[in-house]
Amino acid sequence: MAAPVRRSVVFVTGNAKKLEEVTQILGDSSPYTLVARKIDLPEYQGEPDEISVQKCREAARQIRGPVIVEDTCLCFNALGGLPGPYIKWFLEKLKPEGLYKLLAGFEDKSAYALCTFAFSTGNPEEPVKLFKGQTHGVIVEPRGPRDFGWDPCFQPDGYDQTYAELPKAVKNSISHRYRALSELSAFFLQSNPTEAPSSPS
């Protein structure tokens, strides 16, 4: 019997590390094959959900087909949730060391990482669906490899290593991205029951 045909969905990213991580987490069970595309999208401002929906709608308009957009926030509780959705610019200017120093005057070093995946079928009449995951932790002096954003300064609760120091398999089983992708994957399988593999390959 022929294997089910996997449909493709465009994942908007120019970040090879992010694509690698998302592909690893989704695994072979997804009825969709990810196709990475770098698209120039406007830099929206507002609440995280609003930003995700706007970006996904614009990406779907450009792609004219199914599309996934990811947004990540790093929220410091002492700063009322900042940097939040603006973490990319904070990181570019401050690096992980600067993010750590932002909390130098605060006793509360707690933070949470929030990942939102927005999915559009490509049909502008249909609503954008959001899938969110959150991981709580603390901001620490940077440790570990510097090849993936703010990972060196975020230590998840229950661990004595930063995201950067943790083995990939461990990070991918607890991360904010993993939690959001679990929701997205469940939705894909639920909405494509006939296309999901009946047994592990």
Curated annotation (Swiss-Prot):
Q: What is the lineage of its organism?
A: Eukaryota, Metazoa, Chordata, Craniata, Vertebrata
> What does this protein need as cofactor?
Mg(2+); Mn(2+)
Q: Where in the cell is it found?
A: Cytoplasm
User: A Gene Ontology CC term for this entry?
Assistant: cytoplasm
Q: Per the record's keyword annotation, is Metal-binding included, yes or no?
A: yes
Identification of the protein by name: Inosine triphosphate pyrophosphatase
**Catalytic class of the enzyme:** hydrolase
User: Per the UniProt entry, what species is this protein from, by scientific name?
Assistant: Gallus gallus
Keywords per UniProt: Cytoplasm, Hydrolase, Magnesium, Manganese, Metal-binding, Nucleotide metabolism, Nucleotide-binding
